[in-house]
């Protein structure tokens, strides 16, 4: 894949954010994630199902207050899929989304996955498209999602997990 310019990248350039902690949380502690999901996306559903292999739920807190989340799971033997994530409105553009992405990617790499993937809707969430392009992700697919009535982009990036 390197011959196509698709090389694994080192850790993302995440700024130091004083007071920020990111932790993996169990399904039993989803209340804050559900609340943030409603506030950010105006919908109850976080993801279609939590019955996924290698389910990972990360919660970001700033000075103890929940400010963001990221949810992902195994898509295939080599691919980990980040299904959803978000940052509360008053904390956007502070590096929290990048910190969540970096944290999840490091955990995924430690589990041995070779590819980290996510989909985004550029007309709804243009920041994720920019974040992907600025951090070594490759656009690998574009299609139309009839549920959201929007175009969807698929981004992937290789991890440094050994083959």
PLM regions with names:
Residues 2-45, 153-154:
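Short amphipathic alpha-helix that is part of the acyltransferase structural core
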Residues 3-9, 144-163:
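C-terminal "cap" of GNAT-fold acetyltransferases
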Residues 6, 132-142:
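Conserved acetyl-CoA-binding loop of GNAT-fold acetyltransferases
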Residues 24-79, 83, 88:
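Acetyl-CoA-dependent GNAT
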Residues 33-41, 104, 108, 132:
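Hydrophobic alpha-helical core bundles mediating ligand binding, dimerization, or RNAP-core interactions
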Residues 87, 93-106, 134:
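Conserved acetyl-CoA-binding loop-helix of GNAT-fold acetyltransferases
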Residues 108-121:
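Conserved GNAT acetyl-CoA-binding A-motif
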Residues 118-129, 146-147:
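Conserved beta-strand-loop-alpha-helix junction that forms the acyl-donor binding cleft
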């Amino acid at each position: 894949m390197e011959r196509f310019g698709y090389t694994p990248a080192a850790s993302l350039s995440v700024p130091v954010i004083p007071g920020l902690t990111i932790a993996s949380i169990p399904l039993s502690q989803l209340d804050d994630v559900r609340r943030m999901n409603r506030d950010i996306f105006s919908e109850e559903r976080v993801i279609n199902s939590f019955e996924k292999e290698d389910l990972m739920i990360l919660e970001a807190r700033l000075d103890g207050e929940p400010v963001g989340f990221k949810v992902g799971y195994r898509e295939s033997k080599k691919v980990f899929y980040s299904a959803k994530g978000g940052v509360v409105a008053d904390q956007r553009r502070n590096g929290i989304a990048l910190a969540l992405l970096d944290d999840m990617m490091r955990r995924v790499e430690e589990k041995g996955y070779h590819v980290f993937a996510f989909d985004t809707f550029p007309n709804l969430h243009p920041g994720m498209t920019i974040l992907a392009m600025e951090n070594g992700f490759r656009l690998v697919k574009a299609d139309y999602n009839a549920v959201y009535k929007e175009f969807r982009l698929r981004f992937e990036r290789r991890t440094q997990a050994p083959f």
